Amino acid sequence: MPTISIRGNEMPASPIRKLAPLADAAKQRGVHVFHLNIGQPDLPTPQAAIDAIRNIDRKVLEYSPSAGYRSYREKLVGYYAKFNINLTADDIIITSGGSEAVLFSFLSCLNPGDEIIVPEPAYANYMAFAISAGAKIRTIATTIEEGFSLPKVEKFEELINERTKAILICNPNNPTGYLCTRREMNQIRDLVKKYDLFLFSDEVYREFIYTGSPYISACHLEGIENNVVLIDSVSKRYSECGIRIGALITKNKEIRDAVMKFCQARLSPPLIGQIAAEASLDAPEEYSRETYDEYVERRKCLIDGLNRIPGVYSPIPMGAFYTVAKLPVDDSDKFCAWCLSDFEYEGQTVFMAPASGFYTTPGSGINEVRIAYVLKKEDLTRALFVLQKALEVYPGRTE
C-alpha cells in the first residue's frame, strides 16, 4: 500500500481541536462541557450581515473575482483608514479566512528551506502553513514570568542566517494576549530593514486592545512598506468565523501578483461570506463598543478567577481574547484530556487547549493551557469553579 507524504506525517495536530473527540464523548455521556479551547465568539453576528444573507436575491451563486469583490475592498479602505492605515483597494486581496492569507503569504514569499522567525508560544497553524510551504519556523522564546514580552533584539539576531527570509508576529497575540509596544515594533522594523526581511503581521485582534496602549500596525512602520504583509480576518471582530473571509494586504505589487496566481488557482473567495462581510462594515458603532465592553468584563472575570485558584497563575492579557495560564500539573496535555475523559463535577467539565501545542521547543508549555474567554461571565465563573475542583483531585497535581 502506498504511504502518505512526509509532509502529511510532519503536519502537527491542532492543540485547539485534537481533544474534540473526547469532548464529544463526554457530551454523549450527558456531561456539560465548557468550551474554553477555541476562539469561537458567542456574541451575535451584526444584524446587517444576517439581513444581507437573508435578502440574497441572486439567480446564480457565481464565482466572485479571484481578488474578491471590488465593492468590498473599497469599503475596507475606509475601515482601515480609521486605524491610520492608508490603502487603496488594489492593496487588498480577499482570502478564504485569515488562514489562507497566511498560507498564500508563505507560498508567495518563501522558498523551500527558507526560515521564519516567530516568537513562541504562537498560533499553532503557523507551523502547519510553514510545513505546507516547505519553510521552517525558528522560534524565539517568550516566558509567562515576563508576561510574554518580546526578547531583546540580540536574541532575534542570534537566529538570523542566510536562510532567514521573514519575521512573523501576531499583534495582539494569540495565544498570549500580548500587545507589542512601540519600541518593540520599531526594533522589528530595524531588523527587517537591516537584513531585508519580509514582515508578516497577523493583526486579526486589533479591535480588542484593553490597556489604552496605542495600536501599532506593521503598516505604520516607515521605511519597510514593501516588506510588510498584513493578515486580517472578519472572524473575530464580527463573530463570523464560519463565513471564512480574510484579507492579505500589502503595498508590494510583486507580492500581490504572486499571491494572485494562488488565488486564481483556488478560483474565488466565498461569495456569500463576502456579502456578509461587506454588510458588516455598516454595523453601528454601538456593535463594536458593546462587543469590546463585554470582552473587557470577561477578561477581568477570567483573570481574577484564575489567579484566585491555588497554584494557578495568569498574566493579564493586553489584547485579543485569550490567556495562557500556568497550572500546578505534571502535563497539561494529560490534564486537559483527563478533564474530558475521567472527570466531571456535578455533570460539568472544562475543555482547554494544552499550551505545548503552541510551542515548537520540546518541553515548553508543559504545564500551561490556553483559555479563550468567549463565554458569558456566568459560564466563565462556573467553568473556573469546575477547573478548581478538577485541579484538587487530578492525580498528576504538582503542588
Question: Can you name each region flagged by the protein language model?
Answer:
Residues 2-4, 8-14, 19-34, 38-56, ...:
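PLP-dependent class I/II
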Residues 59:
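Basic nucleic-acid-binding alpha-helical/helix-turn surface characteristic of O6-alkylguanine DNA
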Residues 63-96:
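Conserved N-terminal alpha-helix of the aminotransferase class I/II PLP-enzyme fold
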